[in-house]
């Protein structure tokens, strides 16, 4: 390598521009021009030692003039990235570029030329000062040739490391370098001489060969690294200007530091040379040599005590430990940025403070100079970080990265359960819309749309918005005989856009229009045909909808014209004469009441308005979207044309919509006529408004507000969401006067759902709703009748919710016109009813991923009795109302409506009530943020007509009878329904308060059954309340849960209502006060109960498939039920539930931890399947398990939360079976676990008997005890330190710790392994150790404890580099070690034991890492870049060609201690004892002699 680099003739220069083609670069002697492109591209260390050069370079070769002093130059890393990444940037350039020398001229030939110039960067990258210097230099230069005028284009720009300036040509870069260089150091004699012919003849000696263009004015120190120059100036500041300058007598190196000067001199005169036996590496530093050897052996002695990180260098471990401690000692000098290492600070300064940022993100305005950060940023656009950490704000783009983050950063959090499927996508504002727009808009030739088009479109939209508000009354669509008028006018702004833009192609042809009209007429002829309607809506369901609420200006002119033209044609088709007196001013100006019509004809009024704000809505782009858009218009027109004035026609319309896979998912926006402000909430962003109204003469009118392009539709997996905004005095058909149907401030509760019973609806007055339609599978089939409600066929049992601004109202399948609503607060499948169970069993809400099969036909008949009959039994009545009682008068023959209301933050269920001829008193209770309280009073004195609801083939569930003169009161506080069942002819007062978010059910059994009271109320889990009334005694159950109020449950007797006693068989009960932060359990002997789960006190359960989980929870805050009326419950002591049948849901899908209470006090191993409940019934064996063998490896916590893998070969689990109930103790001193890892990530093999235990306890300087077997035979191993025992073995068999007669079978450690740590501790570095089985003297008797143990250690084979064996002083008198060394040919024949009292190895401590790294070779070494981190000088290097001759010779390690030597070096006067060492050392100096002789020959020639 030396000969390749030094003996280089002139040729192509690194800088191949035309300006400096004939410049004599006085310091360019590295011959970089002859390197190939591959060598320039890949980083390559070209480090040569002792290259003695003096004199001048000419075109023929290297000429040297020896003037009494030898000059030495260093060659360092050369590649085209050397200016940014390499530590040894060597760009040689002098400010005196005008010095001409005929012998020092290089003819530059362009290597790779291109016609494209780089003149564009002249005005942006260069300052005015540089441009002036360029012009001056051009005048002083000789004219260049035509070939040199062709500029060369480099693959990567030239980069100035001090300021990160980049240039694409030599001209720019060379002049930029002049700015950073100081004045050239010139001797006093050279300063007097003019820069003319004298300068040509004799160049100053100090400036002949410099290390870089940056030079110090005071001492002449020169370098090419700006940070070295700044460090050099600090020496001047400390010692003053008169500080001594140290210069090298061999080369031009100079410094103000004596330390660095001596360090540099050792590069020329090395004393000790360490050579590698496996490669050609050599170094004069022992620590560098040791680090290089570890690259061959793979040894990593520096291991992190927190995680599994290990390193071969101490500096790397120190840097790694800062990631755990958070220490950031390095600070940026220009700002407050801090980092854990200097490299991060340097990169920060390069990116933020220094130089240009040429890397620009194509997706946004982000700019940077760091390529790694640039790639990470672009990846966020392509692959966003959608995996969010549940603990901190970290986000990852890959699941594995998030798992590694949680394991490394949050190892102490054991209750973290990450479910990636539920992780939400986190995106920036505006990025989602941009990405969606980019996927749909056609990009031709990669052009980007002008923002002017977007601005013009925005102005057009604003004008359209104003016109739509003013002319809303005029745009009413009239549908007569199924035909639509197509005549309308364009607005002025639309005409401007149409005239200014290119006319797009026609989207819909005549044949398409004719088929469109044909489909409308077919629907009119047969509106009840489900198949025809379904087929026509297929494309509507699968249409591609684009979310354009966040799209900014990304639409082409052509597409803009298409959208506008389609919009205009849409207005033409939908405009018609105004036929009614009703009108609306648009979505934002809708009145609270609509003028009622008094005419008795059959008329239909429909109103269409164009989208008011396109910037907030979605745009359908592309031809396919336009086709889908036309089909959506057709569907809406067909739906509008199907509406008649008759009630049957109204049902037909809804039937048509329902049969087209409509699963209505609505959100109500209620405007209540009280002092409360109007609340509105828009779930979707674009809307089709469908308004229905019917007056006293049964006139039905519909106002349809179709937004342009159905812009705000949202497409889910198989569902298409559409919003409908309605205004109605009463949503359903009424025959009575509307003023009698007043339900102001009413807040409906959630529907009581039991199996698939039909539910009636409450009338609503003055409600403004936004209906969110979700198109799903066909679930409903209606049989319409003008006088009776429709027959409802429920398929799928999907619950419906009404969404309020502050609550979600769940509705069951009722009348089709009552808008079955599904809230967005919770997925529909969380509330599905399993209809396959019996009626007596409580309905468990489960979801197994499939639609439940429940097809029940429900018939709703007219009221016939004073009971609400449900399969010949009574059903309870429940209402949720406002703050004041309101009289409700429902229609006798008409279905009732539903009033939306706001209560709480969760969905609310509504119980339908159909009173009779007299008004029913409804008292709504709205307690702030607490669940809504509803009280329904049905008095005996007034006749009450209750509608009968009959379910075919369904068993009876609930029965309610009003008897006597006392009222029957049902009071419910909460968002979930309650069921009360009592016995006939008896007074029953049931007050139930359910916890938030969960249903509470109070049920009773038949007569003459024992009375049992059970109440369970908990968060996030279903609860069941059962009440059984015996005989003729009244029963009262009261459960109160409101905020932090105490809970009390009292079963009342007939004689004394206040005498309460918990009912159960020797089992006291406990009740959790719902709404608080504490969890309690109601544990009563019953057939079925649910164990509540508390999210704050429960044990964290991390469940995987076929894992065994230990569930042991000891409750601290248990309580006893109070027996005094209206007093808080005492929850003070503990109860167990082992005598109950408790089905416990251990599902982890909702990430809820599991809480179990078990009275035995022993761990319970429960195999838990993923997302499947586990039944802890009474039949389960609660005794000692027969087999405790683990299915998976044990989870032994090591190093702050990490788990130790004790599996064998990662396939079979380790056998850690011990005495039942006793854990295995593997802890060490300071609570640190033992490190039992074996080899390269291979687990240890631990074999023990069932009663065996292991104790490895080390405390302070005490003896560690290893206890195994039944007989308790102990080995006492003296430990001088508290450090953990490292039994790591590499490339060796697993360690067998099984015990036979008190002695381990084998304890082998492969070559290069050791006990303890390498850093500042005692090192035992030998080939192999084996405890001999024949050492009978080491057997320890039973039941005896000795403080010391003698070990016989045998060295199986010698180690090539056995240097020292360090043993603590305590072991010198106690450890008897038998050491035997033998040669390679004697290892197999047996060895001879030599008994000694101490180890025959030298005792010494490890030498600390020296900052001086000295001479070392980088060939074959992976640590070449790391060993020079703390050094300014890279040192000397070996020549591979010279070392090849030594490869066959035996390698002899040079000891650190010097002995008498007989061979004296002629260069450095060193003496050597062996001739081999002397020869090796002498050849090191001959490298310089070779170049000196070569230089002398060149001079002679």
From Swiss-Prot:
Residues 186-209, 491-514, 569-612, 885-929, 1040-1079 are annotated as: Disordered. Transcriptional repressor which binds neuron-restrictive silencer element (NRSE) and represses neuronal gene transcription in non-neuronal cells. Plays a role in the early development of the nervous system and is required for proper patterning of the neuroectoderm during gastrulation. This involves the correct speciation of the neuroepithelial domain and adequate development of the non-neural ectoderm. The C2H2-type zinc finger 5 is required for nuclear localization. Keywords: Cytoplasm, Developmental protein, Metal-binding, Nucleus, Repeat, Repressor, Transcription, Transcription regulation, Zinc, Zinc-finger. PANTHER family: RE1-SILENCING TRANSCRIPTION FACTOR, ZINC FINGER PROTEIN. This is RE1-silencing transcription factor A. It comes from Xenopus laevis. It comes from the Eukaryota. Residues 1067-1079 have a biased composition (Polar residues). One of its GO terms (molecular function) is zinc ion binding. It is found in: Nucleus; Cytoplasm. It holds the Pfam family zf-C2H2_REST. Residues 186-200, 498-512, 594-605 have a biased composition (Basic and acidic residues).
